[in-house]
Amino acid sequence: MEFVGIDIGNYKTVIASSKENGKVYGDEQGKRSIRTVMELSTPVRRFGNGVTNDVEQSLDLRSRSFRDALEDKKGWGNLAMFMKYIDRVVKKNTPTHPPICMAVPAYFKERERRILVDIANTMDFKLEGLITDISAIAMFACVRRENMPSEFLLFDFGFSKTTAGLFSFEKNVLKPLYMKTVRVGSMQFDEKLIDIIVEKHSLEKSRLVREKIKRNLDKIKTTLNSTKCCNIQLFITENPLEVIITQEEYRNAVKSYLSDLDSFVSSVIKETEFNGLVEVVGGNSISFLIKEMLRDKVEYQVTLDVSDSTAIGAALGMACMSLRTRYSLHDIVGREISIRIQGEDVSPTVIFKSTELVEGNPKIVTYNRKESFVLEILEDGEVISTLNVVKGETKETKAIHVSFSIGKFGTVCVNSVECEESVDYEYKPFRISDIDLDDIKALEMKYRDGELGLERIGTMRNELETMAVGLGDALYNKFGKITNDEELNTVREVAMDLFDMPQSETVGQEEEVRNTILSKLEFISKKLSDYRDAAVEDLKKHKDMINEFRKEYGSVFTPSFYKLQGLLYKVDEYLKDFDLNLFNVKLFDESFIMEIKGDIQKYLEKAKLEIEEKRKEEERKSKKENAQEGTSSKPESKEESEAKEDNDEESDVASIDE
């Protein structure tokens, strides 16, 4: 069984399969990493690596960072469209429609997780689980590396954040012990690098200029990672721009962010009390600035893939959680979940600590109440949902047992509310309203219907042009007997007219173009139809010849008779699908008809000869048998009769024994 892991980061998205111990799926261009960007251009949207044209008009249609832009409806719609694009990439790579596990940041809480699940369900995105990204990386490490220590620390220096995770790995069971995140990554470094270039060369402080510089940042950073000075030519304006940046300039520009990361790493080491070899991953980990910062703080190694680890780990993690495998993964809640009765001035009761397991044992809380009440569910001290427990008022208090659990998506679930008397309850977690979900679905359909229509228009025009271009030569080579030069010239003129017609904007317009071209070629269609009718009639006559032969000689079986049976089947199969029109005339092969007609004639004659030969053989055999019977019934001579009598007399005496 296959599982797919998806890491939708703020910079890039990676799709991986659990096949082959972790295999990355490429996009329509075959690239392993898909840029997390979308452009709502018309008539066709652009996604990922297809977003290439940096012009002012397209920038206003461009969106990024879908994962972390879930605070409003616009962000929901953008994420939904990008998820649907990712779903199409998955389906292009595998026909099995496998379950999907998505990696999410450690700071994703109840609201973000539920938004993600609601959008996935609306988009028919087969999301079956969420896993914290640092846990996915740890899973990847355990599966790919031998002799993993029983406890290890990971640092993921990513694009928009930096995450640390401490894990235990005993008896092939992986469990997170500690997680921490700071919202600082290479994104902030990149913005400062762009600022240096803009200010140093007095460039226009526009979004377009920043986008053009952004496309060259990888080259600049790669150079700075190996040399103290980068000298590069950028094409930002009409004239090429010579850009010179030093490591020192870059270091000073990101000084405050480096300080934040330095403090973050120090706090993680102090809080975990870890003193072993640290594993470092993430795209920002290759920066000379990060290497300098880590050099005097920890002993570390970089042995995992800096880009694909999260997606592969998510796929492998879901496989390990769903199947009986050698490895087992337990993710943790990552935040504190508590409850309290609404309106009561009491401290909340903690039911799930941050280090408790997702899909772990449920927690049952008992309340002794006489009447209905409302429970507030809190996440790190903030109310995220309510549970309205409705019971009839009684004189005596009754025990009401409420069962809570953390589901596969890391969200709080109410399993049951039980009481010895009748009780009802309504759980009200955060969810996107049905109206908003319908709007999200309608937004995707609006764009997708137009794109599919455009694809259909392109397919229709391509089919029409292919037919028109090749029709003249096909008629000349295969149907020269039923067409003349004037007709062939007309066909070629129609093809030229087609290429002068503008591209249609709607399917209806393209259908009008198609009907116009076909009407001009109606005289050819009539000739082809007449030819087909004549060929069908001719083949049916040959069928009748075989059937008449079978009626006359049905009881006589010869090799050629069996061959005729096979030819009859061939003709029937050919006639089932035999069609001749403008679009398949190039594929028509008259030789089959000529060969099968010739074979029928040949084997009819051979069958007649074989039957005649069989008849003569039977006559010869009959004469021979008659001759043998005549010899055995011939009258005995007088001498033979007397001799026989003498023998009979002798035999009467010879049979006596002593």
UniProtKB/Swiss-Prot annotation:
SUPFAM superfamilies linked: Actin-like ATPase domain (SSF53067)
Gene3D superfamilies membership: 3.30.420.40, Actin, Chain A, domain 4 (3.90.640.10)
Subcellular locations according to the entry: Cytoplasm
Coiled-coil annotated spans: none
Biased composition (Acidic residues): 642-658
One BP annotation, GO: endoplasmic reticulum unfolded protein response
GO cellular component labels: endoplasmic reticulum chaperone complex
Listed GO MF terms: ATP binding; ATP-dependent protein folding chaperone; calmodulin binding
Residues spanning the membrane: none
UniProt entry keywords in alphabetical sequence: ATP-binding, Calmodulin-binding, Chaperone, Cytoplasm, Nucleotide-binding, Stress response
Bias (Basic and acidic residues) ranges: 614-627
Subcellular location, principal: cytoplasm
Alphabetical list of InterPro entries matching this protein: ATPase_NBD (IPR043129), Hsp_70_fam (IPR013126)
Region called Disordered, residue ranges: 614-658
Described purpose of this protein according to its UniProt entry: Required for normal growth at various temperatures.
Family: Belongs to the heat shock protein 70 family.
Name listed for the protein in its UniProt record: Heat shock protein homolog SSE1
Taxonomic source organism: Encephalitozoon cuniculi (strain GB-M1)
